[in-house]
């Protein structure tokens, strides 16, 4: 367990000092890997906005009125799935992110749509889409909230990797007026259990923190150490995302004070010191425009999924950067941008971490 003294030591580090310490960590990598920053060219299948939680910061939730590309839907139509797959093939995307609200199948309107499409359960719908993607040489990465162990086990057969944000370990967020007041399954114990179950099943896993939703610096550090302990036990966390909160019109949550970029930079550097070179750190590039060089110097080595054809459904007002533009920024900053798959290389040959379905597809994709 992290001590208060250690947290204070991290807090008191200047950004310049952190950059020097991060450089020392990075220099422990081989020369070939030292300045490589990865990304995955992907597209998103936004399956359903219906969600059993009502997080105060969430714009994606079906309770928030929307129109246009990010309009609410009970269930994505079959025609749109096929259209996006066709476009994904044309753009040479190797990953499809399957996302939805949590447990949309509990809502009657979603159940009705599933029945119309001949599916008994939402998970059957996910398996169907994942199989369809694999048939088209696109690797699925599913992030649809907390799932039972058996459903995780089923999805592993058809997914290259999966994800669930820890978000925070702060209990304060569940108090009256907190962002998780009406979100019972955002309890840290429930999400930690899900992440551990993924570890037991040897699923290459993406997780991370939401920064600026009412938590304190010490909460961020505690959450990072929680993820480190889980990874030390199971070895399955392939990347940690540090995602800053961005305000959107219509959401209930209005922070007392807005997150400063320096706060995000600091926790990024601290995360690199905590994880060393064991786990890649990602900050979404569309949320840090103009500060990419600073984040590179403070330890990020991944930009995550970047889509040439679908929006960021969580932050629809923040367009993805052009890959060519990001490549130029990296080059000017002394880094090399490199495309990756939704499963990191080290997990491909790691015993038990990919199913036979995925193994076959990796051979044809590579």
Where are these regions (language model features)?
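Active-site-proximal loop/turn and secondary-structure-junction residues that shape catalytic pockets
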Residues: 43-45, 102-104, 144-148, 168-170, ...
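Auxiliary Fe-S-binding modules of radical SAM enzymes
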Residues: 1-16, 20, 82, 89, ...
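Conserved Radical SAM active-site core
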Residues: 64-232
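Short, well-ordered alpha-helical
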Residues: 4, 8, 13-49
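Hydrophobic faces of well-ordered beta-strands that scaffold small-molecule active sites
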Residues: 37-45, 94-98, 140-142, 162-164, ...
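Canonical Radical SAM [4Fe-4S] cluster-binding loop centered on the CxxxCxxC motif
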Residues: 37-80, 103
């Amino acid at each position: 367990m992290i001590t208060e003294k250690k947290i204070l030591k991290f807090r008191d580090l200047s950004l310049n000092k952190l950059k020097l310490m991060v450089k020392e960590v990075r220099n422990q990598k081989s020369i070939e890997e030292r300045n490589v920053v990865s990304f995955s060219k992907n597209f998103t299948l936004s399956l359903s906005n219906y969600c059993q939680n009502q997080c105060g910061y969430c714009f994606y939730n079906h309770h928030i009125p929307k129109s246009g590309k990010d309009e609410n839907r009970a269930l994505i139509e079959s025609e749109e799935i096929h259209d996006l797959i066709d476009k994904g093939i044309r753009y040479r995307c190797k990953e499809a992110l399957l996302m939805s609200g949590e447990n949309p199948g509990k809502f009657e309107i979603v159940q009705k749509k599933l029945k119309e499409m001949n599916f008994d359960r939402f998970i059957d719908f996910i398996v169907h889409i994942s199989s369809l993607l694999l048939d088209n040489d696109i690797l699925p990465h599913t992030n649809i909230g907390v799932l039972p162990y058996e459903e995780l086990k089923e999805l592993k057969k058809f997914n290259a990797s999966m994800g669930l944000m820890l978000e925070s370990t702060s209990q304060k967020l569940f108090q009256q007026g907190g962002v998780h007041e009406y979100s019972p399954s955002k309890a840290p114990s429930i999400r930690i259990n899900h992440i551990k179950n993924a570890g037991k099943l040897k699923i290459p896993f993406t997780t991370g923190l939401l920064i600026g939703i009412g938590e304190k610096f010490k909460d961020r550090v505690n959450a990072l150490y929680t993820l480190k302990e889980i990874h030390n036990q199971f070895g399955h966390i392939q990347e940690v995302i540090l995602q800053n909160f961005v305000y959107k019109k219509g959401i209930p949550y209005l922070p007392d004070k807005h997150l400063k970029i320096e706060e995000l930079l600091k926790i990024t550097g601290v995360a690199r010191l905590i994880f060393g070179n064991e786990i890649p750190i990602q900050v979404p590039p569309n949320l840090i425009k103009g500060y990419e060089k600073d984040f590179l110097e403070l330890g990020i080595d991944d930009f995550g999924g970047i889509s040439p054809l679908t929006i960021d459904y969580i932050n629809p007002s923040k367009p993805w950067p052009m890959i060519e533009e990001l490549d130029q920024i990296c080059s000017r900053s002394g880094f090399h941008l490199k495309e990756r798959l939704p499963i990191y290389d080290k997990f491909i040959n790691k015993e038990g971490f990919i199913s036979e379905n995925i193994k076959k597809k990796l051979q044809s994709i590579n």
